[in-house]
């Protein structure tokens, strides 16, 4: 019994006074990463940006995109919009894990891409709040971009553009 007590006291002292110091933390000290549940749950959400509204369903699959019945590269030929839409999957390391089915209407191409990204982020958040929410929120993908076109004012050519003024 006394020998067991000596071993435990030595183990405790060894933990308190390490023999070597490093600037890197060990794998055991790193923040515990929660296990992701099996990819069997689907999620659905709505995303909006400017005048565009996207109704998005994210279903476990092979990474197939269907937007208004068309493929991603067909609907958004601009690579920048394709990357923008795919960002929530990239940041969560879930590329190719889910199929995306979306119906988008209203607005222009940029607004539709932003609406789709928000809808995807919200549906991924719905699927697994514990693991996904903090990452998506930190990246800013769960926030709705409230910027909209400013209305035209009476007596002006546009929202703020007035006729040229001549002092003399």
Curated annotation (Swiss-Prot):
Q: Any idea which GO molecular function terms this record carries?
A: RNA binding; structural constituent of ribosome
Q: Gene3D superfamilies in the record, alphabetically? A: 3.30.230.10
| Disordered, as annotated region | 1-36
Which InterPro entries does this entry report, sorted A to Z? Answer: Ribosomal_Su5_D2-typ_SF, Ribosomal_uS9, Ribosomal_uS9_bac/plastid, Ribosomal_uS9_CS, Ribsml_uS5_D2-typ_fold_subgr
What GO CC terms are in its UniProt record?
A: cytoplasm; small ribosomal subunit
Query: Tell me, what is an example of a GO biological process annotation in this record?
Result: translation
Q: Which family does it belong to?
A: Belongs to the universal ribosomal protein uS9 family.
UniProt entry keywords in alphabetical sequence: Ribonucleoprotein, Ribosomal protein
User: Which superkingdom is the protein from?
Assistant: Bacteria
**What stretch or stretches form a coiled coil here?**
none
Q: Where is the composition biased (Low complexity)?
A: 1-11
One Pfam family, please name it: Ribosomal_S9
Q: What is this protein called?
A: Small ribosomal subunit protein uS9
Tell whether Ribosomal protein is among the UniProt keywords.
Answer: yes
